UniProtKB/Swiss-Prot annotation:
Assigned keywords, A-Z: Decarboxylase, Lyase, Pyruvate
Name the UniProt record assigns to this protein: Probable pyruvoyl-dependent arginine decarboxylase
Pfam family of the protein (one): PvlArgDC
Keyword Nuclease: no
Molecular-function GO term, any one: arginine decarboxylase activity
Marked site (Cleavage (non-hydrolytic)) residue numbers: 42-43
Amino acid sequence: MSFVPSKVFFTKGVGRHKEYLSSFELALRDAKIEKCNLVTVSSIFPPKCERVSVEEGVKMLTPGQITFAVMARNSTNEYNRLIAASIGVAIPADDTQYGYLSEHHPFGEDAEQSGEYAEDLAATMLATTLGIEFDPNKDWDEREGIYKMSGKIINSYNITQSAEGENGMWTTVISCAVLLP
């Protein structure tokens, strides 16, 4: 049996609780995907896959459903510890080709830093498969321009959740690309 997703939605959440597992559950609830049995998968954006809104995607879910997702996840119980979870996305101009999703889950990076890093990872992985020449030592903004000017990468973006740890609590952040039939 072959399953190639035709739709994807992106979601994120944060949860806080005195128990680690409960903080993860609350992050899933915040992301609106707590009712699924999530199976994490690696980082390929399927060809011809359509992005739908969170609201539309959640309507396609059934409680208990086995649901495939690319997930970035991070947790802390340290007061004021900055955490983030980011999914980077890079989509080729040719929709018959696959793109890339990347996961990044750092400590000490805010949402902008973490998101840009994840987006850079995904775009760089895609660029290398498409034969786009670039200098990996250039900063992301310069490489992003090169990637998009090549005409081979049409879009890149990220979805990121960040938070700071609270005293006496576990804090969990997640960002997910949820893959649908």
